Amino acid sequence: MKTYRRRIREKIIQALYTIELTGADMDSASDWLITPQIAEDSGAVRFYKQVLQSIQDHKEEIDGYITKHTFNWDMSRIAIIDKNILRMALAELLYFEDIPPKVSINEAIEIAKKFNSTDKSSKFVNGILDATYNDLKSSGKIKKCGRGLINNSSRNTSRSEEKHSTEK
């Protein structure tokens, strides 16, 4: 049975939250969150572990992007849930070439709405990710290939990506 990535992303946020609150290591904090449904789907387990590992391996860099776009905010002032949603989305933007940027951003916004650490979490997450995405795109640091992605040379450019880029 195929596991939806939204559910996996929610588990990733729960693992990151556990790690931040308890100081647990990545393996012990994340293994107990893998449900039988996720465990049966090798692709789901692989995605779950790859995203967590990317965040762990590049946490300083990812946090640097968050800090850059949260003017006058200390990282410790950002709600733990929001901070980890941003980390997950930025890891996807930076290190997962097959995931369209719009998907990573939209998923982060929807998860922020669900976990709702504050009444403005989704707007905060959207603003930070949008600013960071535009920065990364203009500096050439996002490398995405394939249908509906940045470096796709075909005419199948997504209307939502065109709309997103013209709104700025």
From Swiss-Prot:
Entry's Gene Ontology BP terms: DNA-templated transcription termination; transcription antitermination
Gene Ontology CC annotation, any one: cytosol
Record's keyword annotation contains Transcription: yes
Region Disordered: start-end pairs: 147-168
Basic and acidic residues: bias regions: 158-168
Ranges annotated as spanning the membrane: none
GO molecular function: RNA binding
Record's keyword terms, sorted: RNA-binding, Transcription, Transcription antitermination, Transcription regulation
Superkingdom: Bacteria
Family: Belongs to the NusB family.
Protein task: Involved in transcription antitermination. Required for transcription of ribosomal RNA (rRNA) genes. Binds specifically to the boxA antiterminator sequence of the ribosomal RNA (rrn) operons.
PANTHER family hit by this protein: ANTITERMINATION NUSB DOMAIN-CONTAINING PROTEIN, N UTILIZATION SUBSTANCE PROTEIN B-RELATED
Protein name: Transcription antitermination protein NusB
Gene source species: Chlorobium phaeobacteroides (strain BS1)
Gene: nusB
